[in-house]
A protein has these predicted regions:
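Sterically constrained small-residue positions within well-ordered secondary structures
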Residues: 8, 38, 53-55, 64-66, ...
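Residues in well-ordered beta-strands of folded domains
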Residues: 9, 48, 65, 74-78, ...
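Pepsin-like aspartyl protease folds
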Residues: 1-13, 42-59, 80-93
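Active-site or ligand-binding cleft "flap/edge" segments
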Residues: 1-19, 64-73, 110-111, 116
């Protein structure tokens, strides 16, 4: 499992982000969701996260910039993700599905992201 902490930009705002291959989905907190397009979910979604169960009725389209590269992905809005190992609040939890979609690979030993597989264009077959 790989985890990297890094700032990404959302609508010009710097957001403390945890890239975590152990999390399937992507989550944002309400202060980030305020600058995103949000919609109500058709039903309440429950997620086991950070030792507890979180519920949401809101989804968002996350448009962000990671190391100068644009990404767009689906995210769930939850009140609080939690704090990192240093006690800093996590604003975005970037999950494995979005990392796979955008060719992002955490390199924990070097505390960086590998974006060599970032797609400049999508080729569908």
């Amino acid at each position: 499992m790989g985890r990297i902490r890094q700032i990404i930009k959302v609508d010009g705002q710097e957001c403390w982000t945890l890239f975590d291959t152990g999390a399937r989905n992507t989550y944002v907190i309400p202060s980030v969701a305020r600058v995103l397009k949000t919609l109500p979910t058709p039903r309440t979604i429950r997620t086991a996260l950070g030792g507890g169960v979180k519920e949401t009725n809101t989804e968002a389209v996350l448009h962000a910039e990671i190391e100068g590269r644009p990404i767009s992905t689906y995210a769930l809005v939850i009140e609080q993700i939690g704090n990192d190992e240093n006690g800093k609040p996590i604003e975005i939890l970037f999950g494995a599905l979005a990392m796979q979609q955008w060719g992002i690979r955490p390199v924990p030993d070097e505390e960086r992201l590998d974006l060599t597989n970032y797609p400049e264009e999508f080729v569908e077959f």
